[in-house]
């Protein structure tokens, strides 16, 4: 049995800046504890930063750690892979200690809601099948009505 700690700057995952609206960094937690059924990260969103709109091929669980954030769920309209209409259908506030489950293939965004304070959460990405790769599809959007392309 292995253990790790969610705090500290070690074990950083290289983050593609095109996946976020502002500076964000991720600490890999699953590597040291040898987790094989899920990828686990401590994700830090700088002031006002959010993920871009995206969905995963597996379920995801978020646990609020620091600050105030939100999870926003969107519905897709249209059949094309990119350049489609969207509508926000739910906004869930995430405070320290809150936990939320996001089903696979749910179009969503999450991150900080305060432009003056950071927000962090634990993300547990549950693999769709044992020994499979957890995949995320990222989109450019206006967060209101339109997705313009896959990032």
Predicted feature descriptions by range:
Residues 26-28, 40-44, 61, 91, ...:
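Conserved hydrophobic/aromatic beta-strand scaffold that supports enzyme active sites
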Residues 42-46, 55-78, 124-127:
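Short, conserved beta-strand element in jelly-roll/cupin
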Residues 76-105:
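Short acidic-glycine-tyrosine-enriched beta hairpin
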């Amino acid at each position: 049995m292995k253990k790790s700690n969610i705090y500290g700057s070690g074990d950083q995952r290289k983050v593609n800046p095109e996946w976020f609206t502002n500076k964000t960094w991720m600490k890999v937690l699953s590597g040291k504890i040898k987790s094989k059924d899920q990828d686990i990260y401590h994700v830090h969103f700088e002031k006002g930063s959010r993920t871009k709109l995206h969905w995963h091929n597996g379920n995801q669980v978020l646990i609020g750690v620091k600050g105030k954030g939100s999870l926003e769920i969107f519905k897709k309209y249209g059949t094309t892979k990119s350049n489609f209409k969207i509508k926000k259908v739910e906004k869930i506030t995430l405070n320290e200690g809150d936990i939320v489950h996001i089903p696979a293939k749910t179009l969503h965004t999450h991150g900080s809601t305060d432009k003056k304070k950071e927000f962090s959460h634990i993300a547990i990405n549950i693999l769709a099948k044992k020994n499979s790769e957890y995949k995320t599809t990222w989109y450019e959007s206006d967060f209101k009505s339109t997705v313009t392309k896959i990032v």
